[in-house]
Swiss-Prot record:
The gene is AIRC. Residues 262-426 are annotated as: AIR carboxylase. This is Multifunctional protein ADE2. It catalyses: 5-amino-1-(5-phospho-D-ribosyl)imidazole-4-carboxylate + L-aspartate + ATP = (2S)-2-[5-amino-1-(5-phospho-beta-D-ribosyl)imidazole-4-carboxamido]succinate + ADP + phosphate + 2 H(+); 5-amino-1-(5-phospho-D-ribosyl)imidazole-4-carboxylate + H(+) = 5-amino-1-(5-phospho-beta-D-ribosyl)imidazole + CO2. One of its GO terms (biological process) is 'de novo' IMP biosynthetic process. Residues 1-261 are annotated as: SAICAR synthetase. PROSITE patterns: SAICAR_SYNTHETASE_1, SAICAR_SYNTHETASE_2. It holds the Pfam family AIRC. InterPro entries: PurE_classII, PurE_dom, SAICAR_synt/ADE2_N, SAICAR_synthetase, SAICAR_synthetase_CS.
Amino acid sequence: MAPAASELKLGKKVNEGKTKEVYELPDIPGCVLMQSKDQITAGNAARKDRMEGKAAISNTTTSCVFQLLQEAGIKTAFVRKQSDTAFIAAHCEMIPIEWVCRRIATGSFLKRNPGVKEGYKFYPPKIEMFYKDDANNDPQWSEEQLIEAKFSFAGLTIGKTEVDIMARSTQAIFEILEKSWQPQNCTLVDLKIEFGVNILTKEIVLADVIDNDSWRLWPSGDRSQQKDKQSYRDLKEVTPEALQMVKRNFEWVAERVELLLKTKSQGRVVVLMGSTSDLGHCEKIKKACATFGIPCELRVTSAHKGPDETLRIKAEYEGDGIPTVFVAVAGRSNGLGPVMSGNTAYPVVNCPPLSSDWGAQDVWSSLRLPSGLGCPTTLSPEGAAQFAAQIFGLNNHLVWAKLRSNMLNTWISLKQADKKLRECTL
């Protein structure tokens, strides 16, 4: 069990950067303490000022962002917020690359790409990488340069597979945060992140911090309202009044970033089964819904034997105003799905539990339907839950984040399996 905050013992200082210090934690093997500073910098510390309260503001922002990503399913080094100004993270050997993902062309991109106008939008987002070298102003690197560097961290050699994983992860992380800021009417313009190799698990994880130094954030998509560190970079002269303006911007972001962990959007799945003999199949749907954070209710009703009760149950859920996806589970002769689809404007999906003997025939009661009915069919309980999640994800960034993370993790697992197989056959 981790020690209480008052008992936390600090070991040696592992690293110190412009805005934070990293300490070993002897009582928590494999973890470090990330301690923020009340300091703000720009231009590789060419401009540097003390900003009272920045450590707490940055720690709040980072902790909320990492919690959001971790709950979505992104692998991060974040463990927990330890104090107002520090958090505990897995000890990683850091990969000295800053990964940048851009939706809108601005800043240094315009200087490096003459002729591109500010505001140009990238579809998909633009991925760039920069080697961390203060003496040379963090030069931009290509994928080939990173591969040929043959870096090794915590025993993991950074090759083509690892570079691809970091690039793919950077895009997914950006898109999750971009989607999360949209309900706050804020445009995430670009994002800078770093990865490390966990010294215990030997896997690449999102590490370091993501705070208001890490992105450009434009309320209402308006650059003149920028709330990020660019407001500090743009100062012609740093005065106490100007620094207070910058601090207010940082506080504005820290207050709103906590809202990213919540959603005003409601939603639920209601599984209708024709018989309790199908309960096991329905429980799988409910379990899969839980992985997306979607409430799921199970009901028993037969559209053949009690159509009046089926329609009464339908009206019950239509009447409370909560967005609902109905899943019809009936195998032998699916009346539930078609009857529900023909009598509600809510989405209905069929998920019949087909038997091995008559399944090939029974499935047609879910597939061949009269005109005016729109209930798709999936045989997978997990597929039915995912179908519902994709509907709710249109208006719920937390559900969407889990879907996007699942896509990334599936891609990574295939990439790693391919690498392992190739290594075994060489």
